[in-house]
Amino acid sequence: MGVDEPHAVGKDRLVDAAYAAANFPLPVVTVDLGTATTFNVVDENRVFRGGVICPGLSTGLRALGDRCAQLPQVHLGSPKSAIGTNTEKCMLSGSVMGTAVLIDGMVQRIEEELGRPATLVVTGGLAKYVTPLCRHPLTYDPELLMKGLALLYQLNASQPQHHSAGGGRHYGRQNQHGHAKQRTSPKKRTRREPE
């Protein structure tokens, strides 16, 4: 991976990226619209390069309602235009259309850094509000994470299992050489009849 701290990358981000890299032309950018909005970049050599993390759509709207005294809580929806004619419409446009513009602009910057066009795949619970407003060509796949988990499960299941030199785990008592003692059934004792 082409990142500074591979262990710190969110597993959901890696799963999204793994599925996209296996099923779409490279380079590929995945965008997951949830509590946070995350961008994940896989280059033409299948190297996970990192990405972008910013506040999610609903997180930003909720923060405006909580932190700004004059602004209400707004329910998510699709804005009809960029220019809002009241406070709620302005907030909706800024959040939903603003996220679409963020995606378009960020993918353009990513493509410039990669030096080539990228495939864009969008997923997440809030993507349905945003994807119709994006101008960059994209694929919307609401099941990207589930498909990624299924893919990784299949890949892991198809790998040969490696066992210890002794052929796996041994249960029961071990002899002085560390090998499991073979269990044998006790010998039947027969009663001798007197002669």
Predicted regions and their residues:
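Short beta-strand scaffold segments in enzyme catalytic cores
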Residues: T30, T37-V42
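Nucleotide/phosphate-binding catalytic cleft detector across ATP-hydrolyzing
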Residues: M1-V29, E44-E195
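Gly/Ser/Thr-rich loops at beta-strand to alpha-helix junctions
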Residues: T35-T37, K128
